[in-house]
Amino acid sequence: MNLFLSRRVWFAAAALCLPVAGQVLKVESIANPSAIGSLQASWSTARDGSPLLSWIETQKDESYTLKYAIRRGTQWSEPRTIAAHRQFFRQPAELPEVISLSDGTLLAHWVESPSEGSEAEFSYVAASHDGLRWTAPVIIHKDRSMVQHGLASIAASGDREASILWLEALQGEDGPVSLKRTVVNAEGKVVKEEALDSDVCACCPTSVVKTARGLLVAYRDRTTQDIRDIAVLRLENGRWSASKNVNPDKWKLNACPTNAAAAAAQGERVAIAWFTGAQNSPRDQIVFSSDAGATFTKPVVVSTGHSFGYTSIALDAQGNALVSWLEQGGAAGARILIRQVSPAGVAGPVIQVAEGSRRSLGYPRILQSGNETWIAWTSSATAAKVQTARLVK
């Protein structure tokens, strides 16, 4: 089911600004090379630190193609194709990603439907050493049954390897859903698959980052009493920590919110932003860690109205976090908002980036690239199109 519905989108620009380390940043719309019909955008950084944007484009035969482009200086590279004529799973939370390993190898992962209209999901990975020629896509999971294997995230976990975190529902919608990790090498081959948590929230995306000590995975856990709070796992010195909640929200929900956590890391610094509906108060919160996720501060609420969640987060060089989320408001019902929060928990002013319907805005993504912070989302005033903007001095 294509969740991207038509709506009017507009951009709030130069008059909106926020202070960062004594300077003023403004929101600036930047054109990108994605075509009409593009959606499900995501960010990473290339080997040299430049912003790398990936997205899906609709083809004339109603299949989809995964593309990416890199912005260096003031110019985008020509869009390059990773995988063409595939049946990508078209759901805002299922974002394909492309990352660079330390040697410049690119790894891409994505989720496909085995057939049109199927709710089953298969997760794939492919690799490229030159950014032009890609290996044949490989399924990252051993199981091939027609169930969920998705909501994946990826991070480099070694010089020539990466870890993909994903969810597996072997018993279908009514059974427990497992959090799993697949290790892939620079050739796009699966090296290892392991289970990390046997019962998590079924339709909430994962988030994985690399800290100075190792991997940190943030996800929405689930207890037998249907408490759905955010938890983290840490991989240090080859061993996984026990699962730990970042905050006891105690959100009880006998359903799946399709809303999880977003994590960002910079050395020992970690910041996590997430949505909760606990106490019948829909809101977005953020916590910080100065010890790679071993401990966290008390949460700071960043949303100011009725939040829909779908958070994204980035950390700047000073340790300030920039958080984006969707909130109720505007003529079409929803707005993309961003806000800076200092490591001390001081929240800056709220900035509106765009407005539209809740579903059609997609899952906005934030990236920190050097001194620049970027955001991507989907607009469809007439047809779906990936939009990008940055915060500039």
What kind of region is each of these model predictions?
Residues W10-P19:
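Bacterial N-terminal signal peptides
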